């Protein structure tokens, strides 16, 4: 599974790339900052024909519920001991990565008189590591949608097992 963010300057190129490689698991995604959205939502068709109708085999855009995933990840960053929910990092990961990973925070804002929590960047610091972590979580959910969860790791282990000598 490969997720490509389509929310930048090359949206149509991303759609074309994902369309041509959809059989290989490449999908176009776009972060949606709304409360209650699933980690990876139902795709919408984004390619239209000359009549303005969605093309049958056109590119699909998968929405990613970034607010919920960020809350989940920030909760998991608080785990100090390995176990369920703990995030593992290579020892070589430097402080710059963790600054990017924690470059946003949740603040309380009022919209139409009602309070809501929104994610905002702490400063002008980059947040690419956080975006990548959110999209990696979305890719995991795509795997859950496509494959039997119980067999994902079995398939992975079989594929990566060294060849056993025949007896």
Predicted segments with their positions:
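Extracellular low-complexity, Gly/Ser/Thr-rich intrinsically disordered linkers
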Residues: 99-146
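Mg2+-dependent endonuclease catalytic cores in nucleic-acid-processing enzymes, primarily RNase H-like
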Residues: 1-112, 159, 163-167
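Acidic two-metal-ion nuclease catalytic site recognized across multiple nuclease folds
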Residues: 114-115, 142-167
């Amino acid at each position: 599974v490969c997720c490509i963010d389509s929310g930048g300057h090359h949206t149509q190129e991303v759609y074309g790339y994902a369309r041509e490689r959809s059989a290989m698991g490449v999908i176009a995604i776009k972060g949606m900052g709304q409360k209650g959205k699933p980690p990876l939502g139902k795709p919408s068709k984004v390619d239209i024909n000359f009549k303005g109708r969605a093309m049958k085999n056109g590119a699909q855009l998968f929405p990613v519920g970034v607010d919920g995933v960020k809350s989940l990840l920030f909760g998991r960053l608080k785990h100090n001991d390995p176990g369920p929910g703990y995030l593992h990092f290579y020892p070589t990961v430097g402080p710059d990565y963790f600054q990017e990973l924690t470059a946003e925070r949740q603040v309380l804002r009022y919209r139409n008189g009602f309070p809501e929590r929104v994610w905002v960047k702490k400063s002008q610091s980059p947040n690419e590591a956080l975006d990548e972590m959110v999209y990696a979580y979305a890719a995991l959910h795509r795997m859950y949608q496509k494959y039997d969860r119980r067999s994902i790791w079995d398939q992975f282990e079989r594929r990566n097992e060294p060849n056993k000598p025949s007896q």
